[in-house]
């Protein structure tokens, strides 16, 4: 049974850039959440389509919506600007072309409340034109109740490195912001967040639906794969290696396997893309 205590304010952060076709679906799923004590922060990142007008329409009918308008600066800065003004005890990130089940926030809040968790994570599923219904399996959760267990689960890919799909205690975010990488900004961000967490609940029920499209940020990044991507990843893995090896020496082999996996993935990607040579991948990792 859900805990219906709405005393704690939850801030939902939604960066928006040219998603007019999908935005209403996203916002409808958010404003109709069963958990009502919400601050909904929309950040229009210089959209050139009708996204801003859609945001203004929703703001006019829901007093919980806060609308920020900025010049196009990227998703990282949009999220950071929202974090700077967010008032919630917990923070959730949702992408503007995605949507969530109506009990999404309530389910995650129930987990953080019941287990005194720092983070609750929902299972996610990618959808294209077909809208999939949430599959709810009672008690289908995993609890990671110490930092070593959390880091091990993260390194073994049991825990997501995506900002979306999580409810995060505000205190974990007070000193953390997204770095403005062309890619891997979520990965960079969550290395640091997970290192602070003591209890994480992973709900294996699907309540977050991400839309798979060729013109989204991830689609564009795949098409424009370049050395900028590699430099961003190198920065992340350098921190990854230094920080995690020092703090978790007992997980050394798992840490190095993750670094190797990233290298192999990027070497393979470089072989596919004509604008980056495989030798450039090796050169970057040797420096």
Where do the language-model regions lie?
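N-proximal low-complexity "stem/linker" segments adjacent to membrane-targeting elements
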Residues: 1-31
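C-terminal subregions of glycosyltransferases and related glycan-biosynthesis enzymes
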Residues: 2, 211-287
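Short loop->beta transition adjacent to catalytic acidic/histidine clusters or analogous donor-positioning motifs
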Residues: 7-10, 31-42, 50, 62-66
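Acidic helix N-cap motif at the loop->helix transition within catalytic regions
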Residues: 21-24, 38, 49-57, 99, ...
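A conserved acidic beta->alpha catalytic loop
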Residues: 29, 44-53, 73, 95
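Glycine-rich, basic loop-to-helix element that forms the pyrophosphate-binding segment
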Residues: 70-86
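Donor-binding/catalytic cores of nucleotide-activated saccharide
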Residues: 75, 96-203, 210-225
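Short aromatic/hydrophobic "clamp" motif used to bind/position activated sugar donors
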Residues: 91
């Amino acid at each position: 049974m859900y805990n219906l205590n709405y005393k704690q304010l939850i801030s939902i952060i939604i960066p928006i850039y040219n998603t007019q076709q999908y935005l209403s679906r996203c916002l409808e799923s958010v404003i109709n959440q069963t958990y009502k004590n919400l601050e909904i922060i929309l950040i229009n990142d210089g959209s050139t389509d009708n996204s801003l007008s859609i945001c203004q329409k929703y703001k006019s009918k829901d007093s919980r919506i806060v609308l920020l308008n900025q010049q196009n600066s990227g998703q990282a800065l949009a999220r950071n600007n929202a974090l700077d003004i967010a008032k919630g005890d917990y923070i959730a990130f949702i992408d503007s072309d995605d949507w969530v089940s109506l009990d999404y926030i309530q389910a995650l809040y129930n987990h953080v409340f019941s287990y005194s968790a720092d983070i609750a994570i929902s299972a996610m599923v990618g959808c294209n034109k077909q809208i999939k219904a949430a599959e709810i399996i009672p008690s289908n959760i995993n609890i990671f109740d110490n930092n070593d267990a959390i880091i091990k689960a993260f390194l073994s890919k049991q825990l997501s490195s995506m900002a979306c799909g999580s409810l995060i205690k505000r205190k974990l975010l007070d000193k953390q912001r997204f770095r403005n990488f062309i890619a891997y900004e979520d990965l960079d961000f969550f290395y640091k967040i997970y290192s602070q967490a003591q209890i994480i609940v992973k709900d294996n029920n699907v309540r977050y639906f991400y839309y798979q499209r060729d013109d989204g940020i991830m689609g564009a990044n795949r098409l424009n794969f370049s050395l900028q991507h590699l430099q961003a990843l190198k920065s992340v893995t350098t921190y990854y290696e230094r920080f995690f090896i020092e703090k978790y020496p007992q997980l050394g082999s798992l840490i190095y396997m993750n670094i190797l996996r990233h290298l192999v993935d990027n070497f393979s990607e470089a072989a596919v893309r004509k604008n980056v040579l495989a030798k450039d991948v090796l050169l970057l990792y040797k420096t």
